[in-house]
């Protein structure tokens, strides 16, 4: 027994996660009624979501408190990469829908009664209201826009504090980072529970009737992850991007695939950025910001399902409308930040561009929930891994200057 524990301790995290995945699948197929196994997954995701807002608040506040006025930052480059990458993904999704048009079977019933935003203006309004949220409420509800805003305010104020106060802030950030490390160490057990829950509840046939739609969604995300993002990275870094791309997918993408949340994966991404040599002043802001605005996977989901509805209803879409859809999907995708399945609720916003009634749009959302078992996981993996990729790309681009 001691030998097994010793081997387990020496094994790297990715291999441990792989073992967790295999065990989760086997247990889900063999013993689906032992539902207590799923509790490991719920506890793991809950722990990550609980610690992530505190981690963001302390790291951002500490980074800004230590940064002297006028210090150079790569944030402008990172933000530009986030926005351009999301738009490029949205446009690729429209192109894929033109090449492989898919029609949906829409009924008169819906699978969800959640009220989506009524327009792009409402999405922007919600984001602005999040900025001025009560800081305690922002932490409690994982409102990362609010957390980032207050962390920036506190960090700037701490610049004028005494050295003792700054040291206390640094110690607090280090303590929370240590706790995050402990939680991430439990990832194999948590992911085993998440995989078990998915297999036990849905089996291997849950997505059979929506195979083509799922194939288009996942195929577009893979194309963006392995072609579009590396191309953007190459144009910025002027060097082979694939070793970095695969590292981001291997570490960040795999974990996010199972947590199904960019927000829950923030601690994992921050540790990866640290290991890749990124300036803490950059990644402590860019990673939580990316979990909010860098939503390539969400933009793909919104566009492909909207275009499927358009094809189903026989609506003609010209190039300018497709371009507008890509812009709206890119901007709306920010409203899906950190929420498992959140992108589906933005589909009615895009459908409204083509005069599709909200009742029908919500049926499309219902279809999305059916394929969401895998779609949401792939979406989170793309979103989260791209956060790290573009942060590192901006950093390495700055090294050359």
Swiss-Prot record:
It holds the Pfam family SDF. GO terms for biological process: serine transport; threonine transport. The chain crosses the membrane at residues 17-37, 40-60, 78-98, 138-158, 179-199, 212-232, 295-315, 336-356. It is found in: Cell membrane. One of its GO terms (molecular function) is neutral L-amino acid:sodium symporter activity. Keywords: Amino-acid transport, Cell membrane, Membrane, Symport, Transmembrane, Transmembrane helix, Transport. It catalyses: L-serine(in) + Na(+)(in) = L-serine(out) + Na(+)(out); L-threonine(in) + Na(+)(in) = L-threonine(out) + Na(+)(out). It comes from the Bacteria. One of its GO terms (cellular component) is plasma membrane. It is a multi-pass membrane protein. The keyword Transmembrane applies. Involved in the import of serine and threonine into the cell, with the concomitant import of sodium (symport system). Belongs to the dicarboxylate/amino acid:cation symporter (DAACS) (TC 2.A.23) family. HAMAP family: Ser_Thr_transp_SstT. This is Serine/threonine transporter SstT. It comes from Streptococcus suis (strain 98HAH33).
